[in-house]
Amino acid sequence: MLTSQYLLSTSKDIPYDAKIISHQLMIRSGMIRKTSSGLYVWLPTGMRVLKKIKNIITTEMEKINALEILMPIIQPEYLWKESGRLNLYGEELLRFLDRRKNQFILGPTNEEVVTNFIGSEIHSYKQLPLTVYQIQTKFRDEIRPRFGIIRTREFTMKDAYSFHINQSCLENTYNKFYDSYINIFKKMNLNFCAVKADSGSMGGNISHEFQAFSQNGEDEIVFSNDKLYSSNMNMAESIETIDFFKKKYSSCLIKNKTNTKKSIIMSEKLNTPLINQIQTFLIQTKINDITSIAALLIRGDHELNFFKVEKIDIINKPLVFLNEKEVISLIGVKKEFLGPLGLKVPIIADISTFNMKNFTIGSNINKHFFINVNWNIDLPMPIFKDIRKVTKNDLSPNGSGYLNIKQSIEIGHIFQLGQKYSRKIQQSVKIKNGNLKNLYMGCYGIGITRIAAAVIEQHHDKNGIIWPDSIAPFEVVILPINMKKDNKIKIIAHFLYKKFKKTGIDVILDDRDERPGVMFNEVDLIGIPHQIIISKRSINYDNVEYRERKNKENILINIKDIKNFIIQKLKK
């Protein structure tokens, strides 16, 4: 490729809404351009990166005998009604009518479609197992698209689906995908980990997320310092420390007046640390199809884990908290003064409050709190559940390490779906005895466009992107200095360019009449890993200058040796 025939589209400007480094560098390096909220045009440089990511994924899919297909992005709505996910997905689904008033959606995922058509293609257990995959654009109507391509409305995914006659066969394929994903992300030089995860709206009982570490990640992953435990934040558990306080029980209830509104200020006014306070939240419940209210109790320095709360049978999904107006109407007090004493509703407390003594609660009277409160003396024991987010230095569930928490970007997710979709969409095969049996199913996703951002988050410096060789838009760039003024430089530049092209090296030659500073700045910004600089000074000694993007080390290499040198570099 010659730069004179290429659309570089680099920029010095950073859009006001580009808050994280990957978004900024993707704009500045000419990879993407925004057309609307959560919608982006992929320019040639970005497309070259995506193509290489896809090639790595396709190669690994072929190794595990996954067959490539392509499904329509537009899906009939009735399939989603059959699976029960139409209402579950809610407003993230873009729904529309065609000219005949038929109902369709713009697909965010393809479990319904693939189950429907595979069920009509497979008639016997002898055709199983079968795995298919596609690389396709998806659409989810995100309420708040943000962080560039990390959270968009339109994105490219590799989604795969496997079909089996029994659970053990499903588990075998699931493990193959797990190992395949490890290989894929290693080839992209990502710092990542696989963690146990919740299946969410996808269904099934077992799933794993693949998370790339990033301080700008939306997700949080939890792992022990002994590396024996890992989980996403939703699923993370800890062993509760025993008996935080050594104070004696007191049955004394004391009203303490304060003008405090916020918890942390309240703590200072009462001289009571947050660790010795219990917060109360009121939420909607549904018992025997009757909507009611329940109270959640959590330690003052902890945070509710919405995912864990939603797992409780009586809790409405999604969670609905009573607002200030509703609390005042029901209890007659502002939310910050809510407490469990005297509430005639089910009370669910986090297990971390079990061993608390002489703690502080709201009194259900404005500007008043109760202190020195104890279970079984002043308050009846509530229902205890694990409803909080773990915190750093909590004891690991295995008891042999302490928990750490890091931010991350989800780049892949695999699920054992079991028979969820085949039962609802009624797809089955004949087994040996002639009876029909519902298919077992797994699904396996990789966020292709999101991977590009995750790699940039991990591989960049003040000058731009530092792509690994495997997914760089170009492997090598040739930078001839003052080529328009020196014909010998031009001849050598084109000679090396043709030599690299013939060898199969992905090379670009900067044949523009640009100042050296502009050329160097642009290739550093774009992140091309291997740079060959041809100048009058170097060719006088039959040399060219080699510079590696990641360490900026400059080496003089003889012209006749540079091809083999680059080949060896690319093999590393």
Swiss-Prot record:
Its EC number is 6.1.1.15. It catalyses: tRNA(Pro) + L-proline + ATP = L-prolyl-tRNA(Pro) + AMP + diphosphate. Keywords: Aminoacyl-tRNA synthetase, ATP-binding, Cytoplasm, Ligase, Nucleotide-binding, Protein biosynthesis. It is found in: Cytoplasm. GO terms for molecular function: aminoacyl-tRNA deacylase activity; ATP binding; proline-tRNA ligase activity. Consists of three domains: the N-terminal catalytic domain, the editing domain and the C-terminal anticodon-binding domain. Catalyzes the attachment of proline to tRNA(Pro) in a two-step reaction: proline is first activated by ATP to form Pro-AMP and then transferred to the acceptor end of tRNA(Pro). As ProRS can inadvertently accommodate and process non-cognate amino acids such as alanine and cysteine, to avoid such errors it has two additional distinct editing activities against alanine. One activity is designated as 'pretransfer' editing and involves the tRNA(Pro)-independent hydrolysis of activated Ala-AMP. This is Proline--tRNA ligase.
